[in-house]
Amino acid sequence: MSENKTYTECSINGICSINNAISSLHEVVLLHIKNLAFYILKLKDFGITNDLIKADVTNILYGVFINAAYSQAEYNEITTNLDKYTSQSIYLYEKYCRENNLEIEKPNRKVKKTYNIINAIRTGEKSSLKKYKSLSPEQKNTYEIVYFLCRSIVIKIVELQRLGIDYKDAYYSVLEIINSCELSGFCFDNIKDIFDKSIGVYLELMKLIFATEKKLFGKIEEVDIDTSSYEGKSILVSGSNLKALQEILEQTVDSGINVYTHGFDMLVAHTLPEISKYTHLKGHFSTNRHNYIADFSTFRGPILMSRVYMENIDFLYRGRLFSQDPYVSKGIEKITNDDYSSLINATSQAMGFKKYNQRTSIHAGFDEEKILEATDEILEKLKSNRIKYLYVIGICNCEQDNSYYEDLLNNLPDKSYAFSFSYNKSSNNIYHINSLYDGRLFLKIFRNIEEYKDKNISVFMTQGDRYTVANLLTIKHLGFKHVFSDNFPDNIIAPNTKEILKNKFNINFITDVKSDIEKTMY
């Protein structure tokens, strides 16, 4: 049995555990959104939409899915607005139905208006308990997978919006799922078409994000990313908001302030010419991919961050943290309207780095044309049956159990070939692709996957993060014959979720190389 050796702070310290009170509040908020979703979708069918409601509901959903904590005032504002939107939507829906002689439909659900945060927690606890008691283990775990997909879509919606693009279909896709998931008699088969459509929406969101980044910041270049720290005042930009990074760099030109990136998703910034051109973008500050606690505690300046990545450790650094999240914890300063002046001004109170600290560099980026030329040639051989089995190791560069994949690549069957994204090995039948730290190059290589759906292609997912479940579902949705996942820690894929992925979605989990290769040969 191969085990994934990548453990995060979540699995070691439990810092990503969910507070029951916060979880209960989120349950109540989702009940309000569920009631509203019914009417928003009905009005959409009539051609009636409201962008202000869409923007607010998206922010509220984002807060739920990043596990945001609410103050009493924030909770009141959220539920009051949702109730107001529901009343407005009911009025417009019923008015349209009466004017057009249509039957007025109503959702088979009631939402208790609860504005006191203590009472709301109790209501949320009761709803969660009802869910726990009314659903079978299989139903509960399938419900969780649906929740994971919604979470991934909403986070991607916000990432795309921060790049200036609004993909409305994704918003309505999430509302369709929320509206369709009834606890009473929950049956996945009843929502399968909506679920499959939503996977396609998630895929389209990823493609739009990658295409928009290329349009805004230029074509990816190969670079060596410095991980050293330099003497002087500094700002750390963590997360995935490249527009925020670019704006901070622009506002700190000739200020003497050094800027560093942080986190897996920010590595791409250094490969994009419209960002890397700033000479005071000094490098990437990270001691380890997952080590937020150590990195933030040793950084000598203010930090722009998001709870998408850190969950429950933000309280450790209050006073130095800034965020663009719609809901932030007490002591974290909220950035609005792209005004980073408070973040920049905070460098004057920070220590800054007193001396140069040299570290190794990270090679990143790729020559897209060169790689596509090589992979297209291999895929043509697969198409003409000169290659019988194609193995894809990872969809991007990331950490993995090297011994398993080394053994796998050393024991490929006859007439096979491998694209290795995450394990650095090349030979006559192995092409190592030094991609970036996301799936953009993977999607480019298999841009014409329809031509190869009848071919024997096996994809091994080696990256464990908040998108792992959605990415596994997407790869399966694209039509790859065999999909394997590494054995990630329970905070990435819980054991019960793993069973549903295996039994309902036909996703394999690696065991031993010999057995897994045998599975790929039919």
Q: What annotation goes with each model-predicted range?
A:
Residues 2-51, 55, 102, 109, ...:
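Anaerobic metallocofactor- and corrinoid-dependent redox/one-carbon enzyme cores
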Residues 33, 40-219:
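Electropositive, gly/pro-rich neighborhoods at or near active sites that engage anionic ligands
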